[in-house]
Amino acid sequence: MPTVISASMAPRTGASQVPRTMPQAAQGKGTEAGVGNPGGKYSAIISRNFPIIGVKEKTFEQLHKKCLEKKVLYLDPEFPPDETSLFYSQKFPIQFVWKRPPEICENPRFIIGGANRTDICQGDLGDCWFLAAIACLTLNKRLLFRVIPHDQSFTENYAGIFHFQFWRYGDWVDVVIDDCLPTYNNQLVFTKSNHRNEFWSALLEKAYAKLHGSYEALKGGNTTEAMEDFTGGVTEFFEIKDAPRDMYKIMKKAIERGSLMGCSIDDGTNMTYGTSPSGLKMGDLIARMVRNMDESRLRDSDLIPEGCSDDRPTRTIVPVQFETRMACGLVKGHAYSVTGLEEALFKGEKVKLVRLRNPWGQVEWNGSWSDSWKDWSFVDKDEKARLQHQVTEDGEFWMSYDDFIYHFTKLEICNLTADALESDKLQTWTVSVNEGRWVRGCSAGGCRNFPDTFWTNPQYRLKLLEEDDDPDDSEVICSFLVALMQKNRRKDRKLGANLFTIGFAIYEVPKEMHGNKQHLQKDFFLYNASKARSRTYINMREVSERFRLPPSEYVIVPSTYEPHQEGEFILRVFSEKRNLSEEVENTISVDRPVRKKKTKPIIFVSDRANSNKELGVDQESEEGQDKTSPDKQEKSPKPEPSNTDQESEEQQQFRNIFRQIAGDDMEICADELKNVLNRVVNKHKDLKTEGFTLESCRSMIALMDTDGSGRLNLQEFHHLWKKIKSWQKIFKHYDTDQSGTINSYEMRNAVNDAGFHLNNQLYDIITMRYADKYMNIDFDSFICCFVRLEGMFRAFNAFDKDGDGIIKLNVLEWLQLTMYA
């Protein structure tokens, strides 16, 4: 819940003292803090385990207002100014001092003269990919000020609190931070502006670091990640050596449309999230950072005289050189922003040009059309002005398109609306978003190379309903783009998480199965080839691909390359025309047994629980006690089945064992039930099991108990055994190696064979609840699961009087059903 931290409280270990009072304000001794609330796909489970504190997460406006009222500066409890917000892999050898901008310089400003790409200079962190995306973002003011909300400053209503907005897996989230920034020798350690007293880029980097858990989490990545987080767009990758002939036209249209573009040169290494782009480990990176800082200590003359304003350019610390600088000035393994495309006249011929920016704010291309190129004298003066040519070391430069495709290897384009790049017309695409999860042992089946489990992956039906409007194309074709994105892998790096290798396949659904939302089974994928698929499985946050297929119904199967890898994802489908994309979900139901003859049905406790509707939770009436206490109620005797010639040997065996254990009252408790069942089950040599546990037997009694006595008579026991026998057959069918266990991936089919039809979330929950660490389910757990399913379905149906699939319970009824199950 929100916490007020007293100004007299000591800072955390390793943290520098941070000012907490308003500038020139004598009143107010505190820092207002807020906490977030959890969420997730399994809301019923998560909500059950989250303390109900009665306080909602406070918004930026609420926190800002409270800080102003109390005259305190905001201090973020979720991202505190200490080493926990910096690095997680190891401790930094020197002490950073966290300072607010008014402590770093006089006259701090949030934005000076509008935010532009020259305001971004990389510091001592390997997040050039993120800064390259910021540079692209500054080219589109509408997008920029969605990420960076207006009306934030260090003068009017300053309270040490700022906020930024990012797209996060389908939603826009508002990230609130304080303005404490890590410094060394009174200089910002990480991203800084070209102006010493401008701080929007440093604060934006801090908000993005908070979103991912730490500054270290931003080390190494692809520009497309940040581009998508800034826009909610979808990214397409181009290997420049395999680029289409009209690549320049594609890039030109992307710039005109406001799309963001980044590019890079492969450094010959397999870059992963565990290392910096050249494979430099975090310890080596930190060591170089320390050397870098020591070599660039500020002289006394660099400090701002007291009372003087400072809008001088920042004295730049050269970034750690873990990328490889080439003789031409370009840097391998480094991310650049594409900030413009033009055609210029040179010696009577048109030359295609590309403008790029290095987020370091320095280190530029030194070939043709670079800032210091000797042949600029042959370029017309008006042409120079149009190209804004100036000889400055600001990290931005022109180069010819021919040189661009010769040196660069990758191009990333983030399309804001997924407009068709191949078309001269701008076309608005429709989009559908689906969230999903791979659960180990249930729905993490791996790629097509693993046919035994591939079919268990989440499946999404795609209905392409209308063909494209293209008069030049005679084919009846639907264009669409599929983008698969894995969630939270960067944030979970500190827990050892890395990006999975992911991809997807698309299959056409046979006409006879159109409209059928059933999960496609193993045999379908064994005998049907995919109609389309991602070009490769790759360890990137998102894999996207364009396709052209005829109108029909398809199923998309997203997967990791290897099975048993657990994680969350979102699947987005963009199409030129109307489409429908949804997860394949079975209707939750249970097959009701068909009665062969008229018999009086057994009435179970769960069927009669609604007779207690009039009772309150705190009532202790005799009626309530009689219904719940076996000591208060005498059980009416049940007629025993006659011992006829037709009675099987097994039934006679049961009767004899039951009589021996039950005694004169012919009723058994959970301990006695365990004894009976295990004596009978042990005679089945083909069923390898250690028998039933006491807890399983208690659940069985709760299922079959017809009067709330907590005991079973022979009739109830006989009915229970019939169910166990039918479930035993199913178990033996899937226990193909006769190990006494079944693979958890087979549980979906086993549950279905027993007449229970569940959706994907419930199959995931069953695996989490009943499978062991080897993803196996033993016989006892198997029966326990089926007993629970039978009981819960029966209880629900008893309360669902009108059959609309919705029930209403009071707290007593709810507790009766859940505690006695």
Curated annotation (Swiss-Prot):
Extent of Basic and acidic residues compositional bias: 624-638
Domain EF-hand: 649-683, 692-725, 722-757, 787-821
Region (Disordered): 1-34, 603-652
Compositionally biased residues, Polar residues: 641-652
Tissue expression notes: Skeletal muscle.
Gene Ontology, cellular component aspect: cytoplasm; cytosol; myofibril; nucleolus; nucleus; plasma membrane; protein-containing complex; T-tubule
Region (Domain IV) location: 650-821
The keyword Ion transport is assigned to this record: no
Stretch list, region Linker: 587-649
Subunit details: Homodimer; via EF-hand domain 4. Interacts with TTN/titin. Interacts with CMYA5; this interaction, which results in CMYA5 proteolysis, may protect CAPN3 from autolysis. Interacts with SIMC1. Interacts with UTP25; the interaction is required for CAPN3 translocation to the nucleolus.
Gene3D superfamilies to which the protein is assigned, alphabetical: 2.60.120.380, Cysteine proteinases, EF-hand
Compartment annotation: Cytoplasm; Nucleus, Nucleolus
GO biological process: calcium-dependent self proteolysis; cellular response to calcium ion; cellular response to salt stress; muscle structure development; myofibril assembly; negative regulation of apoptotic process; negative regulation of DNA-templated transcription; negative regulation of protein sumoylation
Name of the protein in its database record: Calpain-3
Binding residues for Ca(2+) 2: 705, 707, 709, 711, 716
Family: Belongs to the peptidase C2 family.
Gene transcribed to yield this protein: CAPN3
Activity regulation field: Activated by micromolar concentrations of calcium and inhibited by calpastatin.
Keyword annotations: Calcium, Cytoplasm, Hydrolase, Metal-binding, Nucleus, Protease, Repeat, Thiol protease
All residue ranges annotated as the Calpain catalytic domain in the record: 73-417
Catalytic-site annotation from UniProt: 128, 334, 358
Chain residues that bind Ca(2+) 3: 735, 737, 739, 741, 746
